[in-house]
Amino acid sequence: MKYYLAPMEGLTTYNFRTNWNHCYGGMDKYFTPFISNRHMNSRERNDVLPEHNVGMYTVPQILTNKAEEFLSLAEQLAGYGYHEVNLNLGCPSGTVVAVSYTHLRAHETVL
């Protein structure tokens, strides 16, 4: 069985993940809170810096409904040494739903 630490808005920053890993360990992957801008702000950048994620398999999560933003962020994250990203296709968080970042709602008939 694999154990993943899912992101929780406002809680699972790199400080939380680092402390969890130090105290409890046991996670196969640690997912970051989503990045939703083509240009990462300082909080988002700090969250994915390799030196803030030592000893953990960290997977940055991208939330966007624009292909060019996804590609730009994926390229930036590759520059930090990441080989995997998670594309969030529909976060139930109120702050996300209110801004219409979710992908699946627009294509419910396809599903």
What does each model-found stretch correspond to?
Residues 1-3:
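Extreme N-terminal starter segment of soluble prokaryotic enzymes
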Residues 8-76:
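Glycine-rich, positively charged N-terminal anion/phosphate-binding segment
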Residues 32, 84-92:
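Non-cysteine beta-strand/loop elements that form the S-adenosyl-L-methionine
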Residues 37, 92-94:
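Active-site loop signature of alpha/beta-hydrolase-fold enzymes
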Residues 96-101:
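Short acidic, glycine/proline-rich loop/turn micro-motifs
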Residues 103-111:
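Single conserved hydrophobic/aromatic residue that forms the stacking wall/gate
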